[in-house]
Every structure is written in C-alpha cells, then in structure tokens.
C-alpha cells in the first residue's frame, strides 16, 4: 500500500509560480510512489474573492473617500475575480486537493490522515501579508505523533530577520524530522 503524504503550501495565490510549484511538488511525490494530497488550506487573506477589499484597506491612495473606493472596486474587482476563478479551476483540475480549510485550528477534522506531512515548496515560512508567520506552515496542526514531518524546498522569502524572529523560526524548525 502506498504511503500517504499531505503537503501544505501556498497554492491558492493567484499566480503561475504558486500553481506550478504546487503541481511540481505533487508530481515529484507521486513519481516516487506516494499517494499525495495537497492540503487545501486557504487563509481569508489569500482567498481571491477577498483580495480587492483587503488591498483597498491597505491603500492610502484609493481608500480616501467613497468615490475613490468605488473606482478602485470597479477597476480591480473583475481582474481579481476573473483571474482567481481561472486559477481555481486549474487547481481543481490538476491538484489532488483535500477538503477546503480556512481556519486550521477550527477545522482539524478536515485534515487528511497521512504517514508524512510536508511543508513546501517555495516561500512558505516568512510573514504573510505583513502579518506574523503562520504556524500551520510549520506543521503545528499535526496530531499524529507517528507521522513524519518534512520540509521540501521550503524557504522564508527573505534573509533579513530580527534576532527574536530567528529564535522563533529556530524553535519551529525543531519540530521537523527532515528538511531539504
């Protein structure tokens, strides 16, 4: 029987790089004989339906008054929505996705059972959207003590972090069995 591997990555970002790295990661594990599932964990701030409003809130230029906000929505929303839908269709067609999870702490029952849990690949460990790091990408949700925790080509996205942040990363990385 094939070993099961569950991969968490930032697969729902609306760009080709995100989609292609997820697909490549899935396929490499499949070729090595694993039954691969991509954990369909999509944070609220990475859901394409929410991008226009989230970017608007952060914009000093467009968030001045009702009229500028309306113009921004009229111009940006169709692009975000149409591109988001197109990428969603590709993800659903080519990726073996788990059930959708938007809050990993509240929806643990949706996390697939696996022999191996994997973070990667690409920039999954750094801050997301200016926020703090997301512990889910360090596999903090894995309850199965027998399961291996691995990182496959995972990165932070930048190299300059405060000493406090480096200590936090160091503690989180100790939970892994293997890091490539």
Model-predicted segments: where are they?
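Extreme N-terminal starter segment of soluble prokaryotic enzymes
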Residues: 2-6
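Aromatic- and Gly/Pro-rich donor/ligand-binding loops
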Residues: 8-16, 20-21, 25-171
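A short beta-strand/loop micro-motif in the catalytic core of glycosyltransferases
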Residues: 177-180
